[in-house]
């Protein structure tokens, strides 16, 4: 009863009731649809609508919308962030949640419509004008054309779009706007009424060439996604530049330093006059190219970055000057003594240009260093090895019996009887009356390509990913040795296109034994996952094998990526192209992954039946031999 005496609490509750919910669009949480729940269905819809298989679906980030706010909104927020649907060449960015309508089915229909709209969205459209008014009008024109294209291509979407337009008209807020903004709003309502098949009595409007001062963009319509243009960037090379030493051998004279500074473009705009505001000095000091310790935490920086609408990344023009330089005296055991067996180059597919980048990746082939002791297996793993060997021994080819031979270890009774009958009938007998047996030839060659990137050093369910991969690899290698198939084992990791390291654990002509077990135990995490170059290199030798059937079995824990431009859709398209090249050479390719999110991208790389997902990491040693038996059979 005395709560009103708590002045701060009373004022706070009143303030919350007044402006607590000031969003432009109403929200109905009880009827919300989450993107994470229907992401796979939407991906299938997008492929069915003709969308590119390598385009991924991701949640859209809330961005600041600069439309005109009401008084309560300005008091509460000052700005409004909306998770607007967007699309670029590689990603469909959809709202993480849609609760716009008081009908769950309508919220779901909006997701389906957005996917169909984005499937036919023109990706080669010109950039929108800088002027806010012209940008709004151009966006409305693109939306009208794209809606017409989507309804013509997919007639089943037209009734859904009609219902959505009617629902948007009912939910779109009525706000006080300036005269020109009201005219743009009338144009938006006219397009919505046209989509809902409602009468529209709005008169045509002639808009000025440019928007006046104070004009603010219209409130975005959730039915019409936007297009995000991303500039194509070249691979960065700044990290490869040598460090400049300020006290290098042979100190520069004053004349040389002056000449170097005159030629350096970074010093060309220096002036003795200071015409800038002094508040800029602190910001300029942060951009000086010197090494400094980091004061902020990574978590704090990540939160600050999430609050930005756009994050621009820049490069330093050269490395910072080093005060001194020295070489570390590494102990002998820290030196990598493994010899390179080859340094080869392979092309890389650039989906933007629709062409290969010739000799773009350098692959360093080397043997794996052996470890002094083999991998230690517990009792359960040792029992699994024995069981897998027994299962694989059944797959070992038996001996085939050849009948009616000139020579052999036994008589072919059928051939003997047939020969005697021919002689008794006055004909000519045959000398091919023997049986001969010989072992059936193995007709399968397989290469196990194992991803040993840095992500395999992660721990899942109290076990390191690489340790489980080693155990699964050892179990499968024992089984393959038991059935007699020809097998090679390769590992791969990368660090830029100039350093893709592929190491040989076992070659085709090498028998499985303690040496191979020691090499498996010696595997250690590397860097990144340039999958396309590794697959091309592994297939080059596999395709040369004389066996009729060939299999490339890829074991990985994540999607392809590298520290340079090799990420996102570029990496997916190159890996998909590499998988197609593997199949074109008569080699079957199959991927096994422990990444629980792999179903979002592996179908695009290897096809619907070209991969297996082992969600439980602990079951990998059991699942991998079973997958191999299925493929080999």
UniProtKB/Swiss-Prot annotation:
Cite the Gene3D superfamilies for this sequence. Answer: von Willebrand factor, type A domain
Record domain VWFA: where: 445-631
On whether Phosphoprotein is a keyword of this UniProt record, the answer is: no
UniProt keywords, alphabetically: Virulence
InterPro entries per the record?
NorD/CobT, VWF_A, vWFA_dom_sf
Bias regions of kind Basic and acidic residues — which residues? 232-243, 258-270, 292-306
The region called Disordered is annotated at 232-270, 290-313
* PANTHER family in UniProt: NORD PROTEIN
Q: What does this protein do?
A: Part of the operon norEFCBQD encoding nitric oxide reductase. Essential virulence factor, probably involved in the detoxification of nitric oxide (NO) produced in the macrophages during the innate response against infection.
Name of the molecule in the record: Protein NorD
Biological source species: Brucella melitensis biotype 1 (strain ATCC 23456 / CCUG 17765 / NCTC 10094 / 16M)
């Amino acid at each position: 009863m005395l709560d009103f005496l708590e002045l701060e609490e009373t004022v706070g509750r009143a303030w919350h009731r007044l402006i607590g919910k000031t969003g432009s669009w109403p929200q109905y949480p009880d009827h919300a649809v989450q993107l994470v729940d229907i992401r796979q269905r939407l991906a299938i819809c997008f492929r069915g609508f003709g969308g590119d298989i390598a385009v991924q679906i991701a949640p859209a980030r809330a961005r600041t919308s600069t439309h005109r706010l009401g008084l309560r909104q300005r008091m509460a927020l000052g700005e409004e962030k909306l998770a607007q649907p967007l699309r670029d060449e590689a990603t469909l960015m959809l709202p993480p949640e849609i609760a716009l309508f008081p009908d769950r089915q309508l919220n779901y229909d909006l997701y389906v419509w957005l996917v169909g709209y984005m499937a036919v969205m023109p990706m080669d459209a010109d950039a929108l004008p800088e002027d806010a008014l012209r940008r709004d009008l151009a966006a409305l024109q693109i939306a009208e054309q794209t809606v017409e294209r989507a309804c013509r291509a997919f007639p089943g979407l037209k009734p859904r779009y009609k219902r959505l337009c009617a629902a948007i008209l009912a939910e779109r807020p009525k706000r006080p706007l300036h005269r020109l903004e009201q005219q743009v709003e009338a144009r938006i309502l006219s397009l919505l009424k046209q989509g809902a098949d409602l009468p529209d009595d709005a008169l045509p409007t002639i808009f000025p060439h440019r928007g006046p001062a104070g004009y603010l963009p219209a409130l975005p319509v959730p039915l019409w996604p936007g297009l995000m243009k991303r500039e194509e960037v070249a691979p960065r090379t700044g990290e490869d530049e040598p460090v400049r030493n300020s006290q290098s051998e042979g100190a520069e004279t004053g004349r040389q330093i002056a000449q170097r500074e005159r030629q350096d473009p970074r010093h060309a705009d220096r002036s003795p006059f200071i015409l800038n505001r002094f508040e800029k000095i602190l910001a300029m000091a942060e951009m000086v190219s010197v090494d400094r310790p980091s004061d902020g935490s990574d978590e704090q920086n990540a939160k600050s970055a999430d609050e930005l609408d756009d994050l621009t990344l820049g490069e330093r023009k050269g490395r910072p000057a080093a005060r001194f330089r020295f070489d570390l005296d590494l102990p002998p055991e820290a030196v990598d003594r493994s010899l390179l067996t080859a340094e080869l180059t392979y092309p890389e597919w650039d989906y933007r240009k629709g062409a290969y980048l010739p000799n773009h990746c350098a692959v360093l082939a080397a043997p794996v260093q052996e470890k002094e002791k083999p991998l230690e297996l517990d009792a359960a793993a040792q029992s699994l090895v024995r069981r897998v060997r027994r299962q694989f021994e059944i797959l070992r080819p038996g001996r085939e019996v050849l009948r009616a031979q000139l020579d052999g270890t036994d008589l072919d009774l059928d051939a003997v009887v047939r020969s005697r009958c021919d002689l008794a009938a006055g004909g000519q007998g045959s000398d091919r009356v023997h049986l001969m047996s010989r072992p059936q030839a193995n007709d399968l060659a397989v290469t196990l390509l194992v991803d040993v990137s840095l992500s395999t050093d992660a721990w899942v369910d109290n076990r390191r990913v690489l340790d489980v991969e080693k155990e699964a690899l050892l179990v499968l290698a024992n089984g393959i040795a038991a059935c007699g198939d020809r097998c090679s084992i390769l590992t791969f990791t990368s660090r830029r296109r100039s350093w893709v390291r592929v190491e040989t654990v076992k070659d085709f002509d090498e028998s499985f034994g303690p040496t191979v077990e020691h090499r498996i135990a010696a595997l250690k995490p590397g860097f990144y996952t340039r999958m396309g170059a590794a697959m091309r290199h592994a297939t080059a030798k596999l395709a040369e094998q004389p066996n009729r059937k060939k299999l490339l079995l890829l074991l990985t824990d994540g999607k392809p990526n590298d520290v340079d431009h090799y990420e996102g859709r570029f990496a997916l398209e190159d890996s998909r192209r590499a998988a197609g090249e593997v199949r074109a050479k008569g080699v079957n390719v199959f991927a096994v992954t422990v990444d629980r999110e792999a179903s979002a991208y592996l179908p695009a790389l290897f096809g619907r039946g070209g991969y297996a997902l082992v969600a439980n990491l602990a079951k990998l040693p059991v699942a991998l031999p079973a997958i191999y038996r299925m493929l080999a059979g």
